[in-house]
UniProtKB/Swiss-Prot annotation:
Keywords: Cytoplasm, Flavoprotein, FMN, NAD, Oxidoreductase, Pyrimidine biosynthesis
Lineage summary: Archaea, Methanobacteriati, Thermoplasmatota, Thermoplasmata, Thermoplasmatales
Quaternary state and interactors: Heterotetramer of 2 PyrK and 2 PyrD type B subunits.
Pfam families: DHO_dh (PF01180)
Gene name of this polypeptide: pyrD
Note accompanying the cofactor annotation: Binds 1 FMN per subunit.
Stated name of the protein: Dihydroorotate dehydrogenase B (NAD(+)), catalytic subunit
Disulfide bonds: none
Residues forming the catalytic site: C128 (nucleophile)
Keyword Flavoprotein: yes
Reaction equation(s) it catalyzes: (S)-dihydroorotate + NAD(+) = orotate + NADH + H(+)
Pathway note: Pyrimidine metabolism; UMP biosynthesis via de novo pathway; orotate from (S)-dihydroorotate (NAD(+) route): step 1/1
C-alpha cells in the first residue's frame, strides 16, 4: 500500500492535506475537530498584535463554486489566542500559527509569541489582498519581505513559511526576497469584486475581496510550478483544491503538501477522509510508493 505521509520543513504529516488559514479555523475546538477528522495539520486564522473586528457584513459572496471574501483580518489579538492553540494541540497533530503585521518588528513579536504558545511552524501572511497597510502592501515590497523573513528567522527556531500573493508583478522576485523562509505557501486569494446588478453597487462592504476556490486553481498551479522550478524550495500549494485530483496537480507542479479552505466551507469537514483513500488508490494504481515521488514530476518532463 502506498505511503501518503509527507515531510515539510522537517515536520512529519500523516497526509499532504492541511487546513488553510481562513474563516473556518477561528477557535481551538474547530481546529481540533478538523484535525481529528483527518487534516494532517491546521493553520490558524491570521492573528495580529491587537484585537480587530474586521469589516461589517456582508463579508462573503458565493461565486459559483468559489468565494469572494473580505473579512478584514478579524481576530482576537495574539495575547488572547494562546488557549485556542492549547485546545487544538489536544489532537496531537501539527499547528501552524498564521500572523500578520505591517513591519518586521511586529511580525517578529507575533512569531516569537506563537513559538511560545507551542506552534510547530509559523506562516507569515504577506499577501492578504483587501486590508490597507497589511498583507499585499507588505508582500509586494521585496526589501520589506526580506527584512521580515530574515528578522524572524533570527529569532525563532520553528520553521517559517512565507505566504505569497498572486497579485504582484513578479512573484519570483518576492520569493527570492523570502529565500530564508523554510517553505513558500502559494497562493493567497486573488483580488476580486462582485456587483449587485439590482442595487447597482458592490456586494462586499469593503468593495474588494479575495477570490478563492476552483476559479483560482490554474493560477495557483502556475505559480507553484514557476516558483518550484526557479527556486527548488519546498512549497505548500493552496487555491481551489476541492478533491484529490486537484491536490495531485499541485503536488506534480512542485508542492510537498496542500492547504484546503473554500472546499471545507462548501462541502464540509468530512472531505479529508475521502481525499485520503482516493489519493492512496490513485497512487496504488499509478505505482507511486511515496508522495515525494510525485512532487514536481511535471517539471522534470
Amino acid at each position: 500500500m502506498s505511503d501518503i505521509s509527507t515531510t515539510l520543513a522537517g515536520i512529519k504529516l500523516v497526509n499532504p492535506f492541511m487546513v488553510a488559514s481562513g474563516i473556518l479555523d477561528e477557535n481551538g475546538y474547530t481546529m481540533k475537530e478538523l484535525l481529528e477528522r483527518g487534516a494532517a495539520a491546521v493553520v490558524t486564522k491570521s492573528i495580529g498584535i491587537s484585537e480587530r473586528d474586521g469589516y461589517p457584513t456582508p463579508v462573503i459572496v458565493e461565486y459559483g463554486d468559489s468565494l469572494i471574501n473580505a473579512v478584514g483580518l478579524s481576530n482576537p489579538g495574539i495575547e488572547n489566542f494562546g488557549e485556542e492553540i492549547n485546545i487544538a494541540k489536544e489532537a496531537k497533530r501539527p499547528i501552524i500559527g498564521s500572523v500578520f503585521a505591517y513591519n518586521a518588528e511586529e511580525f517578529t513579536k507575533l512569531s516569537v509569541k506563537m513559538e511560545e504558545y507551542g506552534v510547530d511552524a509559523i506562516e507569515l501572511n504577506l499577501s492578504c489582498p483587501h486590508v490597507k497597510g497589511f498583507g499585499l502592501e507588505v508582500g509586494s515590497d521585496p526589501d520589506l519581505v526580506e527584512d521580515i523573513v530574515n528578522e524572524i528567522k533570527s529569532k525563532v527556531k520553528v520553521p517559517v513559511f512565507a505566504k505569497l500573493s498572486p497579485n504582484v508583478s513578479n512573484i519570483i522576485e518576492i520569493a527570492k526576497a523570502a529565500e530564508k523562509a523554510d517553505a513558500y505557501v502559494l497562493i493567497n486569494t486573488v483580488k476580486a469584486m462582485a456587483i449587485d446588478i439590482y442595487s447597482r453597487s458592490p456586494v462586499l462592504s469593503n468593495l474588494y475581496g479575495g477570490l478563492s476556490g476552483p476559479a483560482i486553481k490554474p493560477v495557483g498551479i502556475r505559480y507553484v510550478y514557476e516558483v518550484k522550478k526557479e527556486t527548488g524550495k519546498e512549497i505548500i500549494g493552496v487555491g481551489g483544491i476541492s478533491n484529490y485530483k486537484d491536490a495531485i496537480e499541485y503536488i506534480m507542479a512542485g508542492a510537498s503538501a496542500v492547504q484546503i479552505g473554500t472546499a471545507l466551507y462548501k462541502y464540509g469537514k468530512g472531505i479529508f477522509r475521502e481525499m485520503e483513500w482516493q489519493l492512496r488508490t490513485f497512487m496504488d494504481e499509478e505505482r507511486f510508493e511515496k508522495i515525494e515521488e510525485m512532487v514536481g514530476v511535471a517539471i522534470k518532463r
